[in-house]
Amino acid sequence: YESLTIAAPGAEETLWNIEGTINVSLALTPGLQSGHQVRVYFDGEPQLVNSTSFTINEVYRGVHNIQAEVLDETGKLMIRSRPNRFYVQQTTVRGIR
């Protein structure tokens, strides 16, 4: 692989009112090869996915970090992205007195 970057969410991006779900998009050149998997670290917790576009649920307000790497069919690390830090904000409506 030549390059792997996290296209979305962007580095230092602030996401508003996401209702607990983020869409993640990776830019991988060349594309994901048959039998290879993506391991994503979201706030340090790993999960395996079979695509360069996916969603992560139960994402709450605060600062978050995401990083991705591609593994071959034997689990060997092929390439790793730089980590991205992003922020989730929630609009708060104050009560009327």
Where are these regions (language model features)?
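Surface-exposed, short loops/turns at beta-strand junctions within beta-sandwich domains
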Residues: I56-V63
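Short beta-strand segments within Ig-like beta-sandwich modules, predominantly Fibronectin type-III
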Residues: G44-S51
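Beta-strand-rich extracellular modules
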Residues: E69-E73
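Edge beta-strands of extracellular beta-sandwich domains
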Residues: K76-Y87
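Short, compositionally biased P/S/T/A/G/V-rich stretches that sit at domain boundaries
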Residues: Y1-N17, Q89, V93-R97
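Short beta-strand elements bearing conserved aromatic residues within extracellular beta-rich modules
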Residues: V38-V40
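Short edge beta-strand/loop segments characteristic of extracellular beta-sandwich folds
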Residues: G10-E12, N23-T29
